[in-house]
A protein has these predicted regions:
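Secondary-structure-rich domain cores
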Residues: 216-223, 561
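Structured binding/interaction patches within domain cores
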Residues: 220-221, 226, 243-246
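A conserved hydrophobic secondary-structure block that centers on an alpha-helix together
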Residues: 199, 226-237
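Conserved catalytic cores of very large enzyme subunits
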Residues: 2-204, 238-245, 249-557, 562-669
């Protein structure tokens, strides 16, 4: 394997990160369970959640690897995957599956099977959020979920998909704690019926502040302890500087470029240790956040580009050390990856509308180019004001063919965010995160609820709502394919089925939203999300400035080609009958070579600049958008759509019969 990294230190750290086998770490689960046993019913739920993080950070195993400059791991070591039984309590069989499966496996210590069986399952099996969710869902929701009509992100993970703002570089957690106390002092218990609940939430935030500061204090002490034993003078100085950095952050705001990177990483650990949010916390506009520290340190003579790049590459290793929480069942099938989808935005424009490219932007491109890691994901925002030099350098990195950076249009992002009700300033500070989703960084809870299998719903439409794969009546009984005399009649039935399943999905999502708001607040994430402190409300309870829920439509190309095949061949050209097509689908096209050739090769297709197909695509998209976007959610915001599959098209295809576009049964959409 080719070694990568700017110097020997980074090469060694990168190699360790890439070569280390991901493994299950139960330390967090055991600590959290003890906290619940001690404090459940004594503390309010927000305070209990703050205490969980505090107890974990006060006792967790510390790790400073050889040569590390940025410190902190979510678990006991690189590639450790803590479990979150309060969300999803895995069975012992699940643990064996994680350990034994060929792909995306997590090794489990022999003694941890017994801990899971004797401690975790008895305490968490019935009280986990996953169990609460499944008890609360309707039979219609459960059937649709189990048969692959849609997935549910919150079934094994927490709401997340949020991004950092400049705020964490302007304040330390002592400052946040003072802000929280000021908000408590302003509560009006005479006139505000929510004052008591707000106080509980704010007290939980104070405990979360204590948690992250304890972690910093412990790392400062640990670095000094290692420095005392270190015989290499260069490394001793580095360890003492790490200790000095941890004396400052996270309790106080960072003063240097190195401290700013360490501050971000402590915050990242706080968010992803509190719960396992889908997707993980992202740095957002890291180049713009770090550049003031870079410029000051260069001016003061304590930083050069070589050191600045080295520190970035150490941060890249930290991202790659954190595998996504282990998944099982449908959740594994819908997103089978180690990556946790942290995503960096580089370039774009500043909050006042000027060119946002700076010296750190180029360093980040160099870092991407040298590291080529699975995590973090990286993109560049390209605006009308982006220098050609930056665009050219980004293209040089991208042309090497490893998928990064992705390219996004800044003006389109801003327009999309403003269309969704964001202010111009908040839109300019925003960007993309996770896969391709846009959001107002630091100001928005934009939570993904799951994938929606549009081609599967068309399959049900052709069969009177009946699912041949599972042998169940899932949809509305609106007629069989041969009953629809015109394409318009068929499409109207298809729309009714879409709305029926959207109603089921969104009703379930509203209930799930309330379950998380009541039972799984996230006081730490709430601290660093704008407006939660001033409102006294949790991120999971509507505290953010903007609260958006997304439902991802999957299979837009497949459904376009399916509808095109039916409209073009059955209704327009009459090259075969609907009955002949349905028989071909039932036979998985075996013995139907003529029909298969026609639908695959002689029919207008999506993505070919063919208005016949494109007009169908637009009609499907607009209907799906009209039925989702604008629906109110339970947090005072609205639902919106995305169109993306990640890896869910593989799972969705597996639960389907053959499709009219020539896709064979069980093949990806």
């Amino acid at each position: 394997m080719e070694e990568r990294g700017m110097n020997e230190r980074v090469k060694k750290l990168r190699k360790l990160s890439v070569d280390t086998q991901p493994h299950i770490d139960l330390e967090r689960a055991k600590s959290m369970t003890k906290t619940y046993e001690k404090y459940e019913g004594v503390l309010s739920i927000p305070e209990l959640r703050g205490q969980v993080l505090k107890d974990y950070f006060a006792t967790k195993t510390l790790y400073i690897g050889e040569g590390e400059l940025i410190v902190g791991e979510k678990g006991d070591s690189p590639q450790a995957a803590p479990t979150f039984p309060e969300l999803c309590c895995h069975t012992v069989e699940d643990m064996h599956v994680m350990n034994d499966r060929d792909l995306i496996n997590f090794k489990v210590k022999e003694e941890d099977y017994k801990v899971q069986e004797d401690v975790m399952i008895p305490y968490w099996d019935k009280r986990s959020t996953r169990s609460r969710i499944l008890r609360a869902m309707t039979p219609e929701w459960k059937k649709a979920y189990e048969c692959g009509i849609f997935t549910e992100f919150m079934e094994q993970r927490g709401p997340g998909h949020t991004v950092g703002s400049v705020k964490i570089y302007e304040k330390g957690f002592l400052d946040y704690k003072a802000d929280i106390q000021a908000s408590i002092d302003k509560l009006d218990f005479m006139n505000d019926p929510e004052a008591f609940d707000k106080k509980s939430e704010l007290e939980g935030m104070k405990l979360a502040c204590d948690a992250i500061m304890i972690l910093g204090e412990r790392y400062a002490a640990y670095a000094r302890e290692l420095a005392e034993k270190e015989t290499d003078e260069t490394r001793k100085k580095e360890l003492l500087q790490i200790a000095a950095n941890c004396d400052v952050v996270p309790a106080h705001k960072p003063q240097t470029y190195w401290q700013a990177i360490q501050m971000y990483w402590f915050v990242h650990l706080g968010v992803t240790s509190e719960l396992n949010p889908w997707d993980a916390y992202s740095p957002g506009r890291l180049d713009q956040h770090l550049n003031p520290f870079y410029e000051k340190d260069v001016e003061d003579g304590i930083l050069d580009d070589e050191k600045a790049l080295e520190l970035l590459e150490c941060l890249w290793v930290k991202f790659n050390n954190q595998p996504a929480p282990p998944k099982v069942g449908i959740t594994l099938k819908e997103s089978s990856t180690y990556t946790d989808f942290a995503n960096l935005n580089t370039g774009g424009i500043t909050p006042n509308g000027e060119n946002g490219v700076n010296n750190v932007s180029y360093l980040i491109l160099d870092c991407m180019d040298e590291m080529k890691l699975l995590q973090p994901s990286s993109n560049v925002q390209i605006s009308r004001k982006t220098p050609q030099k930056f665009l050219k350098r980004a293209c040089e990195v991208s042309r090497k063919g490893w998928g990064q950076p992705a390219f996004y249009n800044t003006e389109a992002i801003i327009q999309e965010l403003m269309n969704a009700g964001k202010s111009l300033e908040d839109a300019r500070k925003g960007g993309t995160s996770g896969c391709v989703e846009t959001g107002a960084f630091g100001n928005e809870a934009y939570i993904l609820t799951g994938y929606f299998n549009i081609p599967k719903i068309f399959e049900l439409t052709l069969n009177n709502g009946y699912d041949k794969m599972s042998g169940q009546q899932l949809g509305l009984e609106l007629g069989y394919a041969t009953d629809f005399e015109t394409y318009e009649d068929l499409f109207e039935a298809f729309k009714k089925q879409i709305k029926y399943f959207l109603d089921i999905k969104i009703q379930g999502s509203n209930v799930i939203e309330k379950i998380f708001a009541e039972y799984m607040p996230v006081p730490f994430l709430s601290i660093i999300t704008n407006d939660c402190i001033s409102r006294g409300k949790d991120y999971n309870g509507g505290g953010a400035r903007y609260n958006t829920k997304y439902l991802q439509g999957v299979g837009i190309g497949t459904i376009t080609d399916c509808l095109s095949a039916v409209k073009y061949n059955v209704y327009d050209k009459k090259t075969f009958t609907m009955a002949e097509l349905m028989q071909a689908l039932d036979d998985n096209f075996e013995g139907h070579d003529r029909i298969l050739n026609l639908v695959r090769n002689k029919t207008p297709k999506y993505g070919n600049d063919d208005d016949y197909a494109d007009d169908i695509m637009k009609e499907v998209f607009e209907y799906y958008r009209s039925q989702v976007t604008g629906r109110p959610n339970m947090l005072g915001g609205m639902y919106r759509i995305n169109m993306l599959p990640t890896t869910c098209h593989v799972y969705f295809g597996d639960v389907m019969m053959a499709s009219p576009n020539g896709r064979l049964a069980h093949k990806p959409e």
